[in-house]
């Protein structure tokens, strides 16, 4: 089956990404990525290679559950690639007191099954005014 990369597919993938982050569920994380995926935590980082390594890297230093939220959406889709934009918000341990906010851009490449084959992230902290 060949999956066509659409706005809907990318939106569902991004929602799954946020849910996997909120739960740190190994299967939910792994379900996002192809077996041979590359995951770049930043533009100048070496990639984490492969689904198993990506799952393990997510679990190495998890954010405290309940202290963050995020929303991302597609900006541009061309072929099997998508550019997305969104915002991640972090809170103190009480889960309510604002701590920091980050703007995020992801460049994603999908395989024929609609799994992410390449993930690249850019992030900038928003000023606290």
Predicted regions and their residues:
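Short, low-complexity N-terminal intrinsically disordered segments enriched in polar/charged residues
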Residues: 1-35
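A beta-strand edge to alpha-helix "cap/lid" segment located at domain peripheries
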Residues: 2-5, 9, 55-129
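Structured beta->alpha junctions
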Residues: 18, 43, 74-76
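Secondary-structure boundary/capping signal
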Residues: 25, 37, 66-69
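Short beta-strand segments in beta-sandwich/barrel cores
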Residues: 37-39, 89-90
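A short gly/proline-enriched turn/hairpin at secondary-structure junctions
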Residues: 38-48, 61-63, 122
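Short beta-edge strand/loop motif at the mouth of beta-sheet-based domains
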Residues: 46-56
